């Protein structure tokens, strides 16, 4: 008899498939009457998501979103499953009824995870804070208590820092906390500027953070929306965005792109930390806002050591896929 060894990376897709089947199967087959599935049936399915294997390959976190069709709401909790034990080992980690726990992320040593939740938000607001929990259970501990809540977060690759984005919409900035003092340390603000941070990611060496930021904040648009004038303006003039990097040791910030014909929309860093690729959308008013399908966007390659930029594509009314 032959046995095959399945690695954690290979087990992850299989576990996800089983979890999807588990979410769909909500009652014993013997108690169900066979009939065509309806649109409402689909809407009432519990949905798994946010699959996050631990770095040591032992566990996987995931979320289950349970809809309430009549109230037009859904509620999300976090679950944990052993990569070796499979579905029978799955257990629920959070148990709120009216609040949501989402976006679980493991610490680099797999000893705990952090997630976002609105469990302690005022009734009139829906802002997320960050919480700490160990895989063996216990009550979650609150990490942040920031006025505007946390938009997103990520651990540094060396596991020493937890960074998060927070602030008023359009003015969000980046902050970091030391992992060895999450509950008592004051967060360091690592970016500042008149416009908020959009997409961002840690550098592989954990010494810097790359991010996209608009050149300025559109105050006219802010005032319009504050006055409840929310009619969309066709082909509105909007700020361009560029790629930046902040060096955490020197606390210096450097702009990496300033192309006259491209506004940066998203980017990726190479695994060796030598390169960045980014998408540059057209800066022409009637090309950049006419569609969200990236018909006038191109791929660029940035050498980080020299800051030399090479344009890789010449698109015109052609949308690219990932």
Which residues fall in each region the model found?
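A flexible loop/linker signature enriched in serine peptidases of the S9 family
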Residues: 64-78, 94-101, 114-131, 139, ...
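Short loop/turn segments that connect beta-strands within beta-propeller blades
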Residues: 83-86, 134-138, 178-183, 247-251, ...
């Amino acid at each position: 008899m032959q046995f095959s060894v399945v690695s954690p990376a290979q087990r992850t897709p299989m576990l996800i498939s089983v979890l999807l089947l588990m979410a769909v199967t909500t009652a014993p087959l013997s108690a169900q009457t066979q009939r065509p599935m309806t649109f409402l049936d689909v809407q009432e399915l519990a949905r798994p998501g946010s699959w996050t294997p631990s770095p040591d390959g032992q566990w996987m976190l995931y979320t289950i979103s349970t809809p309430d069709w009549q109230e037009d709401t859904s509620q999300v909790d976090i679950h944990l499953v052993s990569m070796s034990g499979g579905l029978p080992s799955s257990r629920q980690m959070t148990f709120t009824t009216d609040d949501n726990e989402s976006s679980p992320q493991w610490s680099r040593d797999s000893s705990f995870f952090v997630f976002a939740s609105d469990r302690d938000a005022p009734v009139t607001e829906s802002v997320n804070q960050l919480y700490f929990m160990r895989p063996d259970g216990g009550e979650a501990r609150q990490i942040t208590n920031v006025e505007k809540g946390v938009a997103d977060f990520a651990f540094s690759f060396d596991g020493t820092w937890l960074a998060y984005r927070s602030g008023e919409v359009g003015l969000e900035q980046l902050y970091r906390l030391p992992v060895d003092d999450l509950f008592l340390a004051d967060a360091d603000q690592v970016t500042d500027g008149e416009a908020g941070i959009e997409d961002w990611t840690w550098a592989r060496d954990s010494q810097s953070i790359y991010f996209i930021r608009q050149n300025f904040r559109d105050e006219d648009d802010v005032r319009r929306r504050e006055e409840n004038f929310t009619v969309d303006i066709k082909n509105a003039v909007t700020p361009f965005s560029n790629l930046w990097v902040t060096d955490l040791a020197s606390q210096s910030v450097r702009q990496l792109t300033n192309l006259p014909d491209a506004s940066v929309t998203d980017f990726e860093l190479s695994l060796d930390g030598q390169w960045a690729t980014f998408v540059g959308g057209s800066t022409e008013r009637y090309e950049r806002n006419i569609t969200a399908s990236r018909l006038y966007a191109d791929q660029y390659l940035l050498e980080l050591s020299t800051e030399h930029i090479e344009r890789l594509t010449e698109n015109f009314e052609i949308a690219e896929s990932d």
